[in-house]
């Protein structure tokens, strides 16, 4: 299924990984968010739970192992073109994970071009371009027990 002008919503899963007072942010290499910093993520596969998807995408893209804790939140991202047609429609489920091991590698550089651990304040102060809702989701993840 094409992500542009799709027939139905595309289900994506974001991995909100926390390590102490920081969350892992990744600079996206492609797609609607290319160049922006946000959470690792990918497409939910048939027969896969959202928790397993978050852990799998994280491991595939960064070689980091983390324990899924549960669903943090879900939201839609819908964009229409000038004629009002749906250009893309993502339903994004954010999963909270606790870091276990791995320092992070750029295993799939076409998808992820940078990695860093940030508090929300550090991310703001760094002046890096952030994905929509990244700070809100970081604060939610870090405030969740």
Q: Where on the chain are the PLM-derived regions?
A:
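Short hydrophobic/aromatic beta-strand or adjacent loop that forms the aromatic wall/cage
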Residues: 10-14, 90-94, 112
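A structural signal for short, well-ordered beta-strand segments
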Residues: 15, 71, 95-97
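Conserved Nudix-box catalytic region and its N-terminal flanking loop in Nudix hydrolases
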Residues: 19-60, 64
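A short coil-to-beta-strand element that immediately follows conserved catalytic motifs
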Residues: 65-74
